[in-house]
Amino acid sequence: MVVLAADRLTVRQNGKTILNQISFNIKQGEQWAITGPSGSGKTTFLKALTGKQFFSGHLTIKDNNLFPKKVVLIEQQHYFKNLSNTSNFYYQQRFNSQDAEDAVTVEEYLQYVISKNVKANNELAWLAELFDLKKLYPERLIQLSNGENKRLQIVKALLEQPAFLLLDNPFTGLDVKSRQTLEEVLYTVAQKGIHIIMVTSAAQLPFFITNVLSLSDNGSCSVAEVKAASRHEVNLKAGTISSLNKDLLHELTVNGKRDFFKFAVRMKNVTVKYDHTILDNITWEVRSGERWSLSGPNGSGKSTLLSLVNADNPQAYANDIYLFGRKRGTGESIWDIKKKTGFVSPELHLYFKKSTNGFDVAASGLFDTIGLFRKINEQQKLLVTKWMQLLKIEHLTKRFLFQLSNSEQRLVLLARALVKNPPLLILDEPCQGLDDEQTAFFKAIINEICVAGNKTLIYVSHYPAEIPECVTKFIKLENGKRIE
């Protein structure tokens, strides 16, 4: 029995065809994955199914009285409001315990959700147990890890009792164990009769997926059962250095100003506590020119460790930490430190105004601000333009951040991190949202920058294949402790 049918579904944006006459049928009991390269319209496709995106053609969803709501979409990023009912969070707020108190707790958030739906109250208990949320009830939303936040948003969606649960890259940013756990609980959800449609990569197809709809750059699609779909292993080792403009890269990096320091980072017996211990007695040295991989499961303390290095965490002053040869708290400002670092994180774009355009996001890296709040001169404009050309994103200069796909947002933020040619690059999941080709290209750039420009690198990824070949040092965290 067909439960969802699409006939010649077409989406056009700004004169460009994103989806071109897509037709398919979803039958009772089927679970679908949507794959395709960056920019092929995967997120647009999900929004069309929910009615959030205008389309031509026909979409028919069979009514089912067991499910009060037809379709619910969980987007890749979620925007929370604080207790003041605004969204004016700032990036460092999660590391400032007093300011973080303006964010609601997990329990308060869920109570608000069920207050609008009496029937949902009966569902909360088993969902909270299934998704292991009860232990998170006292936690502030702004302090949740990627995996914790993803579980919370899925529970919220399921409390609406949808017939179709749509997920946009649900495994992005999750470690191996968290991905396996989420896959298992989604299978349990599917067994309840809910149909799952998720955007993911062909290399991350969950075991319960029955059909794959693959989108292409020209807006067309192909449909296959999983037994005929390719569950390929991603190989990103080769890179795409042949397509890299080496002359421009050397102009922007090798010929720039050199900073001299023996150690970028020196910390001894560092401990960070809030309600509980986040980092426990960490000792770590990063010498000039070293390239490090920082790994560990979700919630192991990686983001907190990076916040100490990037001058975002005030607990640095209570610990024995030296950055670029100076002890924290001896007179240097956070801006003195940030001048020497280029930083990317999975959630950084959430703190920019959506109306900021791609050029201004990249240019803000010159001043380490979340937005461009001053005029820049012609030389600076040329510099930003060249970096965007190098990353092949010059076509995004005038487009607003909210108009960009997740992968395009990520590339603009990479330009922001690189634009001032800093001696230390701190890249936290920089390839999140990029397709295989973009990831290989970015790895090639990082390798070339670090080797030719003698850069110091701290690189975080849950995927070993995403780590650049120039990385030779490794640190691993687990439960706040260094285990490697």
Question: Which sequence ranges carry the predicted segments?
Answer:
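The feature captures the beta-strand-to-loop junction immediately N-terminal to the Walker
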Residues: 35-37, 295-297
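ABC ATPase nucleotide-binding domain signature region
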Residues: 46-115, 306-370
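Conserved ABC ATPase "signature" region
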Residues: 119-136, 363, 378-396
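Conserved ABC ATPase signature
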Residues: 140-144, 148, 373-376, 400-404, ...
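Hydrophobic anchor residue at the start of the ABC signature
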Residues: 154, 414
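Catalytic Walker B motif of ABC-type/P-loop ATPase nucleotide-binding domains
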Residues: 165-169, 425-429
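Conserved beta-strand-loop-alpha-helix hinge in the C-terminal portion
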Residues: 208, 215-248, 469, 473-484
